[in-house]
């Protein structure tokens, strides 16, 4: 069934580290094997190198909210290619796009474009340090903020301890600048601030978690984080690389009505091309060069191809009924999965917000990383492979979300639920 994918992976292993260009693309987290190599994509569908067709819920880990090869976005990219994809000068398009982002996310007085979500988060931390004159940051356990050294840190031995590196090559001295606490645990957050508050430059928050599944904040949690952080003289940074434009036209901060000082963006805002952006209050953003002492630059930053693709993507998302459709299909999918699980005696918990959901093989409600970690990875691995065999492409990790796109249809959801029911039957047997 996947003969050419296996052959291609074996060849890739000779030339590319691990045979993949991002570790999340390997099947290591689901028991190993050769990852399926895709050849083309259109709408909600993939076709692999062996000619098999899939309904796609990976959506490239989030960016492809309008479906693959959306004609309006494709046309914008063609226009960029015809007029030159990289200038190294200012363009009118980057001004247009900055205005669109500011209108959509009012907490951003000023914006700066970069090349990825990792870069956006990395720079917001630098800006926060420049503004506050402090060095330490707080992050929440299990929340991924890119692969820069400072955020590749896991929790220490307790909720108020300094971090330990989560990757080889990250010096302990850098990890010492990071305090990790459990998400949705305001008491642990208070304890961290009581111990380190005068040294904290910023707290880094996914307002809605997307990296150990879709996990919403408890009522009042974000408001308390804001209040406590500002009382300590530190800044609040929202990592909205996954969440911005995912649940509404704007940021999760606007959905939840809680405003940060700085915001990091990526994924969806590029329409499928590489991009990142960060923005925030004017007096904080004025720390950035050429106005201030916090240096950040990029050869590819604000390139016309990514900018025009991003503008086109937001134009599609502004259309009437887009987010209502995503919510409707998400509810339909969640309801069907839960129904089939009950019918076949499969223990699961589903976390869903509008058009994104995570299926945990667990009997407990997931509100933090420890609970997500306790979900049954072995059962998920089997489920993942059963779904792949039935033409459903999911992320190869128990921690990731299923992303619905504007290209998905009710028939796609019905076909997916047929596959889910069959997979659950096999799991039970």
From Swiss-Prot:
HAMAP family xrefs: HemL_aminotrans_3
Molecular function in Gene Ontology: glutamate-1-semialdehyde 2,1-aminomutase activity; pyridoxal phosphate binding; transaminase activity
Official protein name in the record: Glutamate-1-semialdehyde 2,1-aminomutase 2
Cofactor: pyridoxal 5'-phosphate
Classification via NCBIfam families: hemL, PRK00062.1, PRK12389.1
Oligomeric and partner information: Homodimer.
InterPro entries tied to this protein: 4pyrrol_synth_GluAld_NH2Trfase, Aminotrans_3, Aminotrans_3_PPA_site, PyrdxlP-dep_Trfase, PyrdxlP-dep_Trfase_major, PyrdxlP-dep_Trfase_small
Keywords: Cytoplasm, Isomerase, Porphyrin biosynthesis, Pyridoxal phosphate
PROSITE patterns on file: AA_TRANSFER_CLASS_3
Entry GO CC: cytoplasm
Predominant place of localization: cytoplasm
Pathway named in the protein's UniProt entry: Porphyrin-containing compound metabolism; protoporphyrin-IX biosynthesis; 5-aminolevulinate from L-glutamyl-tRNA(Glu): step 2/2
GO BP annotation list: protoporphyrinogen IX biosynthetic process
Family of this protein: Belongs to the class-III pyridoxal-phosphate-dependent aminotransferase family. HemL subfamily.
List of residues that carry N6-(pyridoxal phosphate)lysine: 267
Annotated EC: 5.4.3.8
Catalytic activity: (S)-4-amino-5-oxopentanoate = 5-aminolevulinate
Localisation: Cytoplasm
EC category name: isomerase
Domain of life of the native organism: Bacteria
């Amino acid at each position: 069934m996947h003969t050419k994918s296996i052959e291609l992976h074996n060849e890739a292993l000779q030339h590319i580290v691990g045979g993949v260009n991002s570790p999340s693309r390997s099947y290591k987290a689901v028991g190993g094997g050769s990852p399926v190599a895709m050849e083309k994509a259109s709408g909600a569908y993939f076709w692999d190198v062996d000619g098999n067709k899939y309904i796609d819920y990976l959506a490239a880990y989030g960016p492809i909210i309008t479906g693959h090869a959306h004609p309006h976005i494709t046309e914008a990219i063609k226009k960029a290619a015809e007029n030159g994809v990289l200038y190294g000068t200012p363009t009118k398009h980057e001004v247009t796009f900055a205005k669109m982002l500011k209108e959509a996310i009012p907490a951003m007085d000023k914006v700066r474009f970069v090349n990825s979500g990792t870069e956006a988060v990395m720079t917001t931390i630098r800006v926060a340090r420049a503004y506050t004159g402090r060095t330490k940051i707080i992050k929440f356990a299990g929340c991924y903020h890119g692969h820069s050294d400072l955020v590749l840190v896991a929790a220490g031995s307790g909720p108020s301890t300094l971090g330990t590196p989560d990757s080889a090559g990250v010096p302990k001295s850098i990890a010492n600048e990071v305090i990790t606490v459990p998400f949705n645990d305001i008491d642990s957050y208070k304890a961290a601030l009581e111990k380190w508050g005068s040294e904290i430059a910023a707290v880094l928050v996914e307002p809605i978690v997307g990296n150990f599944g879709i996990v919403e904040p408890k009522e009042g949690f974000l408001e308390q984080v804001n209040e406590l952080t500002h009382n300590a003289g530190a800044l609040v940074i929202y990592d909205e690389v996954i969440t911005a434009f995912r649940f509404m036209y704007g940021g999760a901060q606007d959905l939840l009505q809680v405003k940060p000082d700085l915001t990091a963006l990526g994924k969806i805002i590029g329409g499928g091309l590489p991009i990142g952006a960060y923005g925030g209050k004017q007096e904080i953003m004025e720390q950035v060069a050429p106005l201030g002492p916090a240096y950040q630059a990029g050869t590819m930053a604000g390139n016309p191809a990514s900018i025009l693709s991003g503008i086109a993507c937001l134009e599609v998302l502004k259309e009437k009924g887009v987010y209502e459709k995503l919510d409707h299909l998400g509810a339909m999918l969640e309801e069907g999965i839960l129904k089939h699980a009950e019918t076949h005696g499969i223990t699961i918990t589903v976390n869903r917000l509008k058009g994104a959901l995570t299926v945990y093989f667990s009997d407990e409600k997931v509100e933090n990383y420890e609970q997500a970690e306790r979900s049954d990875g072995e059962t998920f691995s089997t489920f993942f492979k059963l779904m792949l065999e039935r033409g459903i492409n999911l992320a190869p990790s128990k921690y990731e979300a299923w992303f619905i796109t504007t290209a998905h249809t009710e028939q796609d959801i019905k076909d997916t639920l047929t596959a889910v029911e069959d997979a659950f039957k096999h799991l039970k047997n």
